[in-house]
Amino acid sequence: MSQYDKLTLKDGSYLYFKDWGDSSGQPIVFSHGWPLTADAFEDQMFFLGQKGFRVIAHDRRGHGRSAQPWDGHNMDQYADDLAELTAHLNLQEAVHVGHSTGGGEVARYIGRHGTGRVAKAALISAVTPIMVKTDFNPNGVPKEVFDGIREGVVNDRAAFFYELTAAFYGYNREGAKESKAVRESFVEQGLQGSIKGLYDCIKAFSETDLREDLRKMTIPTLVIHGDDDQIVPFETCGKVAAEILPDAQLKVYAGGSHGICTTHKQQINQDLLNFIQS
């Protein structure tokens, strides 16, 4: 199996998706982070596709090559879109892998649609259980930080995306080996999305309370987080998510940034493979 396609959704919009690998293999479904596309998981898809798995990834609505509707950019709709895709492909015993915002999407998908089609899940640098600082989340990220992200998107999103990559990949740390090409790829992916969809998604990834969704994730779940994640702090998200999940395995990458699917791709690939096969 080697293809990409578009799925027309119930509301008339559509999802671009890739469906690679062995069609008879166990399906691994990837949900990407903001403001990226399915391309952000190409290292993992290539690796696991070569191991005999069926690997699937879509561009979230408002992102990449998917439709750019004015409305519907919230975690419930993202989860329902994912449910439509898994039903369309009739996936069974799937492993869902979500990075950053995609981790929230996976959690809400299971929270709303159950585990009937799901065998396992992996949350990488995920926004679960909630990012923003609230009364019940006093150690969260202040809302003013997300207001600044919104301002950056509106004022000059190309420049903002490029600047964001320094913290995203940890290139602002002493001794870090910067890849200008990776930074440019991030910007290119981000600019494919609609400004309205990406703007609205900031509220979705920062303010959605996913605590109850995590409690409903009764399947084995791998939590991977870098302890130097400057975008989604480990202490606020990864650590807390692992404590809430009923059946969690936590792996902390020492010195790991938010973009560990790229900066630590060999380690991510092997940890995912070991988890899927365990």
Language model: regions and residue ranges:
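Conserved HGGG/HGGXW glycine-rich cap/lid loop of the alpha/beta-hydrolase fold
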Residues: 13-71
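Conserved alpha/beta-hydrolase "nucleophile elbow" surrounding the catalytic nucleophile
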Residues: 32-34, 94, 98-100
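Conserved acidic catalytic loop of the alpha/beta-hydrolase fold
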Residues: 77-94
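Flexible "cap/lid" loop of the alpha/beta hydrolase fold
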Residues: 107-112, 116-155
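Conserved alpha/beta-hydrolase catalytic His-Asp/Glu region
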Residues: 129-141, 151-215
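Short beta-strand/loop motif that positions the catalytic acidic residue
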Residues: 217, 223-225, 229
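Conserved alpha/beta-hydrolase "acid-adjacent" motif
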Residues: 230-236
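Catalytic active-site module of serine/aspartate enzymes centered on a nucleophile-bearing elbow/loop
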Residues: 248-278
